[in-house]
Design a protein with these regions (language model features):
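Extracytoplasmic catalytic/substrate-binding loops of multi-pass membrane glycan-assembly enzymes
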Residues: 16
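SAM-dependent transferase fold signal centered on methyltransferase-like domains
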Residues: 2-4, 13, 22, 26-488
Length: 488
């Protein structure tokens, strides 16, 4: 059920359409009508009409799809193809479909194609706007959020700032009751459609901090404060909406609190008694999560969660991406600054390998821990490249990308251009940290046109405070075969 906290009448076209819309059921393999649920869902649930009482909003371009004709048109569209979209649109209009319905359906099909990276096959039955899709949590990450709540034994979760409903989907898929709260009326209406197959979910259009959690029997909260304003990221957590401090204050009423925050958050802004976990998917750092009370079973500290890509393609748990967690055993207060190690003395101290920790491990302050396990050192002062003579073992390999060092050159564009010509290099893979050059500028300067391939790491070697010994270098490397990691 989707309601407005103030129960205001006169719903907008989109809200009215969402109120009347029922997603057609899908025949399951068991022979019953059911909607497909995210991985881990305990059976499907028959969709049902929902009551919507929300204020007018400017999202009428989606309303044509929330009719039987609009939904049928969207369901019958072929896979989105940029090269044929104009001809498909013309054909549909010639067949008598209203132009606004055709435009909305084609736009939605394009967004669904983009959304597959976050929601896998479930994107094909969801509705999106560009902004809402960009801000949505990947389903593979939401599944890990939901697992914390299930393991904590909670029953009724308030998803504050639910967006289009990704985290609420994952929570409901594990059988938890969910109150999904969203202050933006248009986004709340989308969540209504995306979540209506889950009878355990109520969508509420309201200010997240105005909801009486106690009166509604809420025993856990997941919050996702808005971190953008007019298209720009907001760095200060106290300028988020709602402010991080106000969200953390909810622990006075509900001890089981989880908060999705920006991965670049300053460690000093973190609560001292929480566990904070940074997550990356396919090598991309996507978020940090603050976990409090029973949701932090591992205790206060910091960790990195590394998930493989792409998202799951079926309901079979064996198809789920692998997940690895690395924790700093010496950190019991996430607000403390990370340990910084002394760098190599100079280029001559480089080992046989260069290692780059995963971005989630870097954000979590785990570089020193990884260096210790590898018996390695940073190549430069506060540079996240490590060098040593050992490769990571299977337990550490998911958190480190390793290369074998072939040669070390000065960061001199004239000399590099000569190398490219003499070695017939036509393809360059460039990485950089700590030097004032860009890969594009280097590639343009050296002009690779040959047949060979090389990988260069451009970085600073040595202590930045020692001008005589620290210098820019190009480390020519080749990939190493990672140790086999058993699938969990």
């Amino acid at each position: 059920m989707c309601t407005h906290e103030d129960s205001r009448p006169s719903p907008s076209p989109l809200a009215a359409a969402a109120a009347a819309h029922t997603v057609p059921p899908q025949r399951s393999r068991r022979g019953t009508d059911t909607a497909r649920s995210p991985p881990g869902a305990r059976g499907g649930a028959a969709p049902r009409p929902m009551r919507v009482m929300i204020a007018p909003m400017d999202a009428s371009h989606l309303a044509p799809l929330l009719t039987p004709a609009g939904w049928a048109l969207l369901a019958d569209l072929p896979p989105y193809d940029e090269s044929t979209v104009l001809s498909v649109g013309a054909r549909l209009r010639e067949a008598g479909h209203p132009p606004e319905m055709v435009a909305a359906a084609l736009t939605q099909q394009r967004l669904r194609t983009r959304a597959e990276a976050k929601f896998g096959p479930f994107a094909s039955r969801m509705l999106f706007t560009p902004d809402a899709l960009e801000q949505a949590t990947r389903l593979v990450v939401s599944a890990h959020h939901a697992a914390r709540y299930e393991h904590a034994g909670v029953q009724h979760v308030a998803d504050l700032g639910c967006g289009i409903g990704g985290d609420a989907m994952a929570l409901a898929g594990l059988g938890l009751r969910v109150l999904a709260v969203e202050s933006d009326e248009a986004t709340a209406a989308l969540a209504t459609v995306n979540l209506m197959v889950f009878p355990e979910v109520e969508v509420l259009c309201a200010d997240a901090l105005e909801v009486d959690l106690t009166a509604r029997g809420i025993d856990a909260v997941f919050a996702d404060p808005a971190r953008r304003s007019h298209g720009h990221r907001i760095a200060d957590p106290e300028q988020w909406s709602p402010a991080l401090g106000r969200v953390l204050a909810l622990r006075d009423d509900v001890g089981a609190l989880g908060v999705k925050v920006a991965p670049g958050i300053d460690h000093a802004a973190l609560p001292t008694d929480a566990h904070v976990q940074w997550a990356s998917v396919g090598g991309e750092v996507v978020e940090a999560g603050i976990w409090c009370g029973p949701l932090a079973a591992e205790g206060p500290g910091r960790s990195a969660l590394v998930l493989s890509d792409p998202p799951p393609a079926s309901d079979d748990p064996r198809d789920a991406p692998s997940a690895r967690v690395l924790r700093d055993p010496d950190c019991h207060d996430p607000s403390t600054p990370p340990v910084h190690l002394a760098p190599l003395a100079d280029v001559g101290a480089l080992g046989a390998y260069v290692h780059e920790p995963d971005g989630a491990a870097i954000r979590a302050g785990l570089v020193a821990h990884i260096a210790e396990r590898l018996d390695a050192a940073p190549v430069g002062d506060r540079i996240a490249y490590l060098s040593g003579d050992a490769l990571p073992d299977a337990s550490l390999a998911p958190f480190v990308h390793s290369w074998r060092v072939r040669e070390v050159l000065p960061l001199n564009l004239k000399m590099l251009k000569t190398r490219v010509r003499e070695h017939d290099i036509g393809s360059l893979e460039l990485h950089k940290r700590g030097v004032p050059v860009t890969p594009d500028a280097v590639r343009a300067a050296v002009r690779p046109h040959g047949q060979a391939h090389e990988t260069w790491i451009m970085t600073r070697v040595g202590n930045a405070g020692d001008a005589q010994r620290a210098r820019g270098a190009v480390i020519v490397v080749e990939p190493c075969e990672a140790p086999t990691v058993p699938v969990s």
